[in-house]
Amino acid sequence: EEDFEQVVQTNLNGAFYMIKHTCRQFIKNRRGRIINISSVTGVMGNAGQANYASAKAGLIGLTKSVARELAGRNITCNAVAPGFVATDMTAAMPQKILESAVAQVPLGRMGTAEEIAQTVAFLCSDAAGYITGQVLCVDGGLSM
């Protein structure tokens, strides 16, 4: 129970409070971009990760609600949902588990931090000004 609450506090409540405090300036400026980092686990679920999946699914709900609330003020809110990304954490995983996970990805590889960052940068740009309330799964096709 404590682990569940800690994961929700970090991944959902943390985003809520960040949005709450940054929105004041966005509203004042009549412009803003909010990009939440969710996960394909929040879209698909994953055995053994009920706490994380719940928090990330909740973040998607928060994203969509905030997008509706703030759209009239020229503030967009979207979420990026990374799939399997090459990080120090994934590098520490046993090779067999890593290979099994990558085998589920239609593109046949893990994503990179740069690919996630480029997606976030796009959503922050003027080119994404007509995109709000969306979840962009950057997952090599895993969630399709």
Residue positions per predicted region:
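Substrate-binding pocket helix/loop in short-chain dehydrogenase/reductase
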Residues: 3-8, 90, 101
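Active-site helix of classical SDR
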Residues: 19, 55, 63
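A short helix-coil junction within the Rossmann-fold of NAD(P)-dependent oxidoreductases
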Residues: 21-33, 73
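Alpha-helical segment proximal to the catalytic Tyr-Lys
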Residues: 24, 68-72, 129
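Residue(s) in the substrate-gating loop at a strand-loop-helix junction
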Residues: 39
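Active-site loop immediately N-terminal to the catalytic Tyr-X3-Lys motif
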Residues: 44-50, 72-73, 108, 126
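C-terminal helical subdomain
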Residues: 79, 102-127, 131, 138-140
